[in-house]
């Protein structure tokens, strides 16, 4: 599996059931920035023009390098494990979220994500107000500020 953002054909995982699009596969099949993902729902496999949702998996000790979501909102629900976000200018602020927590990330906010555990995977549901998933994400140099 590539963790670089290489895209897979996601249409094989979704069924159009007459206006309700169903996804029943959530296994890890692709990745981006050291995070593994299931197929998810997006504009790639549904008619969505403004939403996407995926199940994300961060390996033990894993880090999603600093980045910015350009012009879209993100809401995350942590199913398993704990993540630490270092965020803001220079990623100098920090907050931890654990299983059962939900949180919102503002568009344009620099952040880097860390799995707090060296032994357990993090599992989370990630929702975006962008149907294109990863195309509107930019790397952020946390040492530049």
Mark where each language-model region is.
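Conserved short histidine dyad/triad with adjacent acidic residue
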Residues: 38-41, 54-70
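Short strand-connecting beta-turns/loops that link adjacent beta-strands
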Residues: 46, 71, 90, 118-119
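Conserved metal-binding segment of the jelly-roll/cupin
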Residues: 59, 87, 97-117, 128-129
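Short, charged/polar surface micro-motifs in flexible loops or helix N-caps
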Residues: 45-49, 58-62, 80-84
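Histidine-centered active-site/metal-ligand motif
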Residues: 67-69, 85, 111
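A short beta-strand-loop-beta hairpin characteristic of the jelly-roll/cupin
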Residues: 63, 72-99
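A short, N-terminal "cap"/entry segment at the start of jelly-roll beta-barrel domains
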Residues: 1-50, 65, 138-145
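A short hydrophobic beta-strand segment most commonly corresponding to one strand
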Residues: 53-56, 75, 104, 119-136
């Amino acid at each position: 599996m590539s963790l670089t953002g290489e895209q897979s054909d996601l249409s094989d995982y979704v069924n159009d059931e007459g206006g309700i699009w169903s996804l029943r596969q959530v296994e890890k099949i692709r990745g981006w920035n050291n995070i593994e993902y299931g197929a998810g729902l997006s504009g790639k496999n549904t008619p969505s023009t403004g939403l996407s949702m995926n199940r994300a998996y961060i390996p033990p000790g894993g880090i999603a390098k600093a980045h910015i979501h350009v012009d879209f909102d993100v809401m995350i629900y942590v199913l398993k494990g704990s993540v630490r976000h270092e965020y803001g200018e220079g990623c100098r602020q920090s907050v931890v979220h654990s299983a059962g927590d939900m949180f919102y990330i503002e568009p344009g906010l620099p952040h880097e994500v860390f799995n707090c555990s060296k032994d357990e995977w993090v599992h989370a549901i990630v929702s975006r107000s962008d149907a294109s998933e990863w195309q509107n994400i930019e790397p952020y140099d946390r040492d530049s500020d």
